[in-house]
Amino acid sequence: MIIAVDGMGGDFAPELVVEGCIQAVKEYEGIHIIITGKKELIKNELDKREYKGNKIEILNAEEVISTNEAPVKAIRRKKDSSMVKALELVKEGKAQAVISAGSTGALMAGATFVLGRIKGINRVCLAPLLPGAKAPFMIVDAGANVDCKAEYLVQFAMMGKVYFESVLGVKSPTVGLVNIGAEEEKGNELTKAAYKLLKDTDFNFIGNIEPRDIPRGEVNIAVCDGFIGNTVLKTYEGVASNLFSMLKDEMMASTRGKIGGALLKPVFKDFKKKFDYTEYGGSPFLGAKGICIKAHGSSDAKAFKNAIRQAKICYDKKIIEEIENNLGNLIENNI
């Protein structure tokens, strides 16, 4: 399997991108990586780490897409950018997956306009996997589509279901529709229409769920439009981050707190690890005609290594084909 990695995307590119790639080719068999970006910079990082293998190569790209550029314009105009070059490798069949920690909007545009959508899929969605109290959960969509139709949400749910079943090995994952109340009649026109459609599928649909229920692990797949999904995601990340800071401040404020903190250090360490995004790799763009993983902007080497592992599993489990097959089932049932 060949994986294209955007070598210039993210806060710590290309240093930690290269480090993550080296770790990945050492740990996972059957992968070859093409790092796109400024050749001299990437080669210097490989040389620093004394990498002498033949499982990593460089494809030169002189341009970089920044996070403050208009996503669609950047993808269309910067043909010599590291992100576009990586996407084109997948489009041309020279790689089977693409990974980038660069601009989310630009990668979304690239997944749609460079890779294209799977035939019959209306919209590509961003599907982050997040730690929950009982088990990880996925939000679909987490920001790619702020305006949606009910049928889009059904497709998002289907693709999330495929990911859980194929990649994570979870049989019959639960699907919940994010809403302001659990009752069927709650919500706006979109959620009411989506509820009716989801109820008629063969998904393990548990009905409406409120945002507070999501991190409790009440559902595997939380379905919503991108506006709601991104709000839920950012709130969740903010609360988790501030919770750790508040606990640390409280413990350091008194002698009793310091003693208690020392005694509970192993517990806090395990708890923090549970919320470590690097364990999950990245967020797939589901519905694209190619495996496309968005790594977190602040990804370290471990996160990149795990994103590469994630891409490999998606490829091995034939996730694109599985989405196509499941889409066919929806169409057969007129949903």
Curated annotation (Swiss-Prot):
GO terms for cellular component: cytoplasm. It catalyses: a fatty acyl-[ACP] + phosphate = an acyl phosphate + holo-[ACP]. SUPFAM superfamilies: Isocitrate/Isopropylmalate dehydrogenase-like. Keywords: Cytoplasm, Lipid biosynthesis, Lipid metabolism, Phospholipid biosynthesis, Phospholipid metabolism, Transferase. Transmembrane segments: none annotated. GO terms for biological process: fatty acid biosynthetic process; phospholipid biosynthetic process. The keyword Lipid biosynthesis applies. Its EC number is 2.3.1.274. It holds the Pfam family FA_synthesis. GO terms for molecular function: phosphate:acyl-[acyl carrier protein] acyltransferase activity. It is found in: Cytoplasm. The keyword Lipid metabolism applies. Pathway: Lipid metabolism; phospholipid metabolism. Catalyzes the reversible formation of acyl-phosphate (acyl-PO(4)) from acyl-[acyl-carrier-protein] (acyl-ACP). This enzyme utilizes acyl-ACP as fatty acyl donor, but not acyl-CoA. Homodimer. Probably interacts with PlsY. Belongs to the PlsX family. This is Phosphate acyltransferase. It comes from Clostridium botulinum (strain Loch Maree / Type A3).
